[in-house]
Design a protein with these regions (language model features):
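Short sequence/structural segments immediately N-terminal
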Residues: 1-376
């Protein structure tokens, strides 16, 4: 009975967070802020494997004990390997399942005095499914098809070579023409098969950029846009370098006093909102300030988007070409519709639900690059 209880405890969040991974305390709040906060650590990091395999995997981690004991581990802490998606992600998220298009509404605010609101509407084409069902396209095509790649860096941010295997067995290879790999280099390099975490690499421990966190706080009402320059001040506060969390809290309190002095009417009219803004600043600072001052959210690239990191553009950049000069498709409407932007007080725009009526040359793989030069 005791052995069973010890085993169950070794699979708990409390054990992982305190006994082992207190070495990187920021990972735990990030995990709790993720969509997978009700999924046990071991289900992703060990995979849903049998008990014997789980014991072997855990035993292999004893090699990290000296680094923990002598405080000599690397920062930021990185996982050398992740369990394959078919032992973790795919046991909940079945690749052949088809997902219909979904409407995304993104609210952002300006850094001007009025915190001008801008709403973006677009259709996300998640897709997937199987070729036999007449599907197997859009974003999740990448995991319902066989896609291999070679990265030249340890974070998979620099993709040098890509190979796809077509349903009929034929293969198509794309090489980065700016720094092409030679055939012998391709043969010797580690080739990886694309799976869920090649895009969703921060799904369990997200470290969003400061601007995204502030926009979210303003959109959900925690930070009132009626406070002049609220976004800019918040960004200045949470993006500054602090020696400790206590130092950040002191800076927040000082700015709150200065703000009330600069805008006495606002402080009188919105006293509760001003206090709430200080609380938001404290929460965001705690989320963004790392124990090691040399580490920040920028050390944790998120491949799921392409605003703050290369993400999709690691491959869809117009530079990966076949021997015939065909590129990996680079279009504004492959994964989502063309974004429609409106002001905060304007009604939502009409977003087309079906395919656009485009001329044939819009579908050419090099269209975006050619269009840019033609427009210039």
């Amino acid at each position: 009975v005791i052995a069973i209880q010890v085993w169950e405890y070794s699979n708990s969040l409390h054990f992982c967070a305190n006994a082992c991974h207190d070495v990187h305390p920021e990972e735990i709040p990030a995990y709790e802020d993720s969509y997978h906060s009700n999924v046990k650590c071991v289900e992703c990091h060990m995979g849903r494997v049998g008990t014997l395999n789980n014991i072997i995997l855990k035993a292999s981690h004893f090699k990290h004990l000296p680094a923990v004991i002598f405080d000599s581990y690397e920062r930021p802490l990185e996982s050398e390997t992740m369990r394959p998606a078919n032992e973790s992600c795919e046991l909940c998220h079945y690749p052949p399942a088809f997902h219909g298009d979904g409407v995304r509404h993104i609210t952002r605010f300006g850094t001007d005095e009025q915190n001008t609101q801008k709403d973006t509407y677009l259709l996300m084409k998640t897709g997937a499914g199987t070729e036999e069902e007449g599907q197997g396209f859009d974003i999740h095509w990448h995991v319902s098809s066989e896609v291999e790649y070679i990265a030249t860096d340890e974070h998979d941010e620099e993709i040098a070579w890509v190979r796809i295997t077509l349903p009929d067995g034929r293969t198509v290879e794309y090489n980065d023409v700016t720094e092409p790999l030679m055939p012998e280099e391709i043969n010797e390099a580690e080739t990886k098969t694309m799976d869920c975490v090649d895009c969703h690499n921060r799904v369990g421990h997200p470290f969003p950029p400061p601007e995204d966190l502030v926009d979210r706080a303003m959109a959900d009402g925690r930070l009132n846009p009626a406070l002049p320059y609220a976004k800019q001040l918040m960004l200045d506060l949470i993006s500054a370098s602090y020696g400790s969390e206590e130092e950040a809290l002191e800076a927040i309190e000082e700015v709150k006093v200065q703000y009330a002095a600069a805008y006495p009417e606002i402080a009188t009219q919105y006293p509760n909102e001003l206090e709430a803004a200080a609380e938001v600043a404290e929460d965001l600072a705690a989320q963004l300030i790392f124990e090691d001052p040399e580490v920040s959210w920028e050390d944790f690239p998120d491949h799921n988007k392409h605003k703050d990191f290369a993400g999709c553009f690691r491959c869809h950049d117009g530079k990966h070409l076949t021997d015939d000069g065909e590129s990996i498709r680079l279009h504004c409407n492959i994964c989502h519709s063309v974004p429609a932007n409106v002001g905060g007080e304007e009604p939502p725009p009409a977003v087309p639900l079906g395919p656009l009526d485009e001329p044939d040359y819009h579908l050419e793989t090099n269209f975006i690059a050619d269009h840019r030069f033609q427009a210039d």
